[in-house]
Amino acid sequence: MAAAAAALAATEPPPAMPQAAGAGGPAARRDFYWLRSFLAGGIAGCCAKTTVAPLDRVKVLLQAHNHHYRHLGVFSTLRAVPKKEGYLGLYKGNGAMMIRIFPYGAIQFMAFEHYKTLITTKLGVSGHVHRLMAGSMAGMTAVICTYPLDMVRVRLAFQVKGEHTYTGIIHAFKTIYAKEGGFLGFYRGLMPTILGMAPYAGVSFFTFGTLKSVGLSYAPTLLGRPSSDNPNVLVLKTHINLLCGGVAGAIAQTISYPFDVTRRRMQLGAVLPEFEKCLTMRETMKYVYGHHGIRKGLYRGLSLNYIRCVPSQAVAFTTYELMKQFFHLN
């Protein structure tokens, strides 16, 4: 993380020169640039995850084969959860999700912009490749910084009404720390998460950025419009942003999904009866493949992930593009 922080610091815009009140220009745009970029990414992440929170809960239940819902499909589970736990059951774990997703989204989008600049200026890598590299690095940075919050969120989402191991976020933190190896207990499943996040974030940012670049290059009038904060910059129209974000999410999710399944099982740890057979990433993937195969194991719940990932990424990229204009980041 120190290396990541140093890399980000290397591309921080220089301090703005004092200007008269109300003055615009490049210097004014650099005022609190990091804070504005951080807020834009955080808001984008929260909007995206709130949109698909019920689907996230169902995904966790299906991936880990919760015994109450193991024989049900995606839509059957969506109907069964409210009957058993009430409609708020679809949002179980969402409080922890919001606490995690704001810094996650903020760090990821902010890091992407800075890594992209760093890779281009310091390494001389340009074209579309720098988006792939910057996206992968940004995703890994965000994961490492916020992983303990995701661990707690998954534990809370896996609980079923009447069978609570944890009473809330703070209790979950205390219990995991006390019973699962202290601080390291919060990082179970980190390796498959990083291995899954690198291609996911990389492909996601690469696909969206490439579609945006190609679209604005070949059909600027049809697909684009001037940015509200900087008329000299073309941005995609909102509905085109949504489409490009959805396509990017679908492609990225297909590539990285087996790592996501592995991560969830490792995060749940002692909550699962087969805990001792899933201590490492290799053991977990071997267990899931051996007992459930590819379609019902490593790719179980993928249909749900398409349903949740496409709108989630569409909303995330679109909201971020709008926030960039609102916070004068273009």
From Swiss-Prot:
UniProt gene name: SLC25A16
Q: Keywords of this protein's UniProt record, alphabetized?
A: Membrane, Mitochondrion, Mitochondrion inner membrane, Repeat, Transmembrane, Transmembrane helix, Transport
- What residue spans do the Solcar repeats cover? 32-118, 126-214, 236-326
SUPFAM superfamilies to which the protein is assigned, alphabetical: Mitochondrial carrier
* Superkingdom: Eukaryota
Please identify the protein, giving its name as recorded.
Solute carrier family 25 member 16
One GO term under biological process is: mitochondrial coenzyme A transmembrane transport
What role is this protein assigned?
Answer: May be involved in the transport of coenzyme A in the mitochondrial matrix. Very little is known about the physiological function of this carrier.
> Where are its TM segments located?
33-52, 95-112, 132-149, 189-209, 242-262, 297-317
Q: How does it sit in the membrane?
A: Multi-pass membrane protein
Q: How is expression of this protein distributed across tissues?
A: Mostly in thyroid, liver, lung, kidney and to a lesser extent in heart and skeletal muscle.
| Major place of residence | mitochondrion
The family assignment reads:
Belongs to the mitochondrial carrier (TC 2.A.29) family.
Checking PANTHER family in the record gives: SOLUTE CARRIER FAMILY 25
Gene Ontology CC entries for this record: mitochondrial inner membrane
For whether the record's keyword set contains RNA-binding, the answer is: no
Q: Which Pfam families match?
A: Mito_carr
Enumerate the subcellular locations listed in this protein's record, separating them with semicolons. Mitochondrion inner membrane
Keyword Transmembrane helix part of the UniProt annotation? yes
Q: Which GO terms describe its molecular function?
A: coenzyme A transmembrane transporter activity
